[in-house]
Amino acid sequence: MKLGLVPGEDIDTFWRRVAGACADWLAAQGASPRDAVLLLPFAQHLAPARRAFLARGGWQPVLATTRSLASALGPSPLAQPGQISGDAPVDALAADALIAQQSWAQGLKREDPRAYRLALARLVETAHAFTRAAGQQDPAARGAWFEAARQHLTDDPVGGTERALALVALAWAASDDRTPATDALFRHRPSAWIALQAGGPDPLARALLAGGDVPALWLDTDLDLDQLAEPVARVEEALCADFETLAQASAVAVLQHLAAGRAPVALIAQDRVVVRRVRALLSRQGLPMHDETGWTLATTPAASTLMALLRAALGGGAVDDWLAWLKLSAEPSAALDALEALCRRRRIRRAEVLDAMDKLPAQALWQARRQALAPLAGGGRRSLLQWLFDLKRALGSEPLAGLEGGAGVLEALWLSRNPWPGSAHEAVLSDARLDGAGFLAWVGEVLEAGQYVPEDAGQAPVVITPLVRAMLRPFGALVLPGADADTLGRGGRGLSLLSEADAAALGLPTQARQREAEAQAFAQALRAPVLTLLRCTRAGAEPLPASPLIERLAVAARRAGRESPLRHWVDERPPQAITPQPLPRASVAAARLPAALSASAVESLRRCPYQFFSRHLLGLQAADELEAEPEKRDYGTWLHAVLHRFHTGRQPGDATAQLRAAAAAESLGLDEADFLPWQASFERLLPRYVDWLAAAEAQGQAFSEGELDRQCRPFDGALADLVLRGRIDRVDTTAEGKRLLLDYKTGSVKGLKDRVTEPLEDTQMAVYALLMDAAPDLAAAYLALDDPGGVVAVEHPDVAATAGQLRDGLQSDLLLMLQGAPLPALGEGSACEFCEARGLCRKDDWS
């Protein structure tokens, strides 16, 4: 029986029509209503169906879903060792044991562990699909179905590893001799079967009605989207420019529906990212919401804390992992902040270094947490059961259960319950042996597979639900953000190990079937009083068209000679005129000029006054990365130390050997992997530097001093007390007795030559010359160490004159700053590209 669309019919009236159709048919069949069964697509349909039958009066049939009725008729049999448990992470370990002895699996596991784990996940996914499909078969035909599936897969040998895995999955599912809980449905004998179809046929219900010996009625409520010229719903469409506009418009649409009395409102979770933002916006309004979709356990605070704990314990002693866990699990404190600052300042990367330090900030907390995770230390292979026991000990008093999602995390990981004796879960937990990395990966898989659904908020005015579960429910309006071609109408993905043709032949889910099911769910949404569709018009720089389902609806209207049913959504928020409020530019507060300026501070002031303001007046700086790869500046710092050690301790004899010895001394304590590229660069530099040094010394040049800390007071008047300071890499004397400033550089010679071409733009050497009193006989040069052609000295001509001009310019600029002159963001090019304050100055937002 077809239950199509009736103009003007609301959902409650529709359900009364269903109740009437059932009652009339049962009477015609002479079947007892109270002994009949009406199978509904989802548990959410039970309440409106009951209301409809109660309104009609008299006996009503048993209202159930196939799952709830099967559960009522008897428990599901327990999975025995070796059988499919339905728990994907546990079954992945069982599948590992299942194929571990096969030669191809051993080779894949050895050569590409990641590909092997992916193969296990696909095997489990396919085995679960076969098990579900088998449970939907008539028990008498199940054996024949398995044989037909096996024959189909073996007849076509194309597929290689994928086909082999699919056959293993099929054999695993077929070897399960348990009686599925759904078999009780085939033994049940009601007075009549009635099945309500919405969103496509239910294979189990079809098999049940086809194989029974009692009267059966199939109520088909599905709508043909291509024939829906005049939907019941008022369909509104909102076109949005970007993500935030989409989220705000969606929240406004929900609020407008509620203000108009259209409650409850279904917020369709088609695009979970957008809906998460919409939920946050609605929460600010204090609006109660019930989320039927939930989210993965891995995204809950409890899971984040647990994974941080495991990364700290099993991450090889990385300080970054330990700090991440401490900041999640401990109360914020100044001592903890000081500990992090210490680690970043000294680039401490290993937890063992902190263990050996005395008078550590937050030392009591550090030692207590290190001791707490001792049960997990080592990372050697253990049984999964032992890992879980040790994890439970490590958690100790950790208030995981008090965090959102904590109870679900503890249950999913078997930390708050025990597996049934003799079950598949107990066997896997006892037999599987994992190392620390394997256990960490398994916990991550469990949390990704688990779902966290918040507690039911009762009669909430907003219900967040998937499109398929919004069908035939008494919502006042539906709001669907993400009605674009990338999000709505594409369907889900098919099975990884089977082609579309194979899946279709075996009755397994296909992409085509999922697309059609989504189209049918969208068509059912057109029964609602109002359907508000919202979408972005662009994805980045690319145009983003409407969903093909919307296009099909518009085509159906045109085919029937009607106007498009889509109406423009009206944002009822009153526009607000915003008066520009210019903010004063940053300036130096009275007496807040730094007591001392370095060469880098002067460079910041000249490159961008706002950069100087943020770095040297506000004291802002980017936090050092603990686990960052060594940078070129780190190599430069190390090389400075090597050359200083070499020159200050140089003895007559082989310069190459002495320089290599200095490098070895400065390398002590460095991570070997980090030092390796430095060693290679240094070996290339070694002969070049020795050659340059010999040539320079042959001309009478000699090392005088290095790493020289200097300061001076070059200004007068109100700036007389301002100190200029810096560290000079090296000072040599020439054959004429002049002093020569040398600054080591590992950059390109071309860049250095470009710098000294405009001497007044070279701040660094001018500042160093001021530090050396800007004597007229002073010379200066950059020493380029990394040029393939050899070590090259790039001279800064007449550096004393440049220093004098720099001093005069700084005197003028600094006096203006003291008088309140603004410090605007005037930087350009590389000054902005590598600036830590970018974004703070808001220059990127200037229009």
Where are the language model's segments positioned?
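Hydrophobic alpha-helical segments, especially transmembrane helices
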Residues: 162-164, 168, 193, 731, ...
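Intrinsic disorder/low-complexity segments
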Residues: 172-175, 185, 206-208, 217, ...
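Basic/charged alpha-beta structural segments of nucleotide/phosphate-handling enzymes
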Residues: 40-189, 199, 203, 337-367
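Conserved RecA-like helicase ATPase core segment
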Residues: 190-241
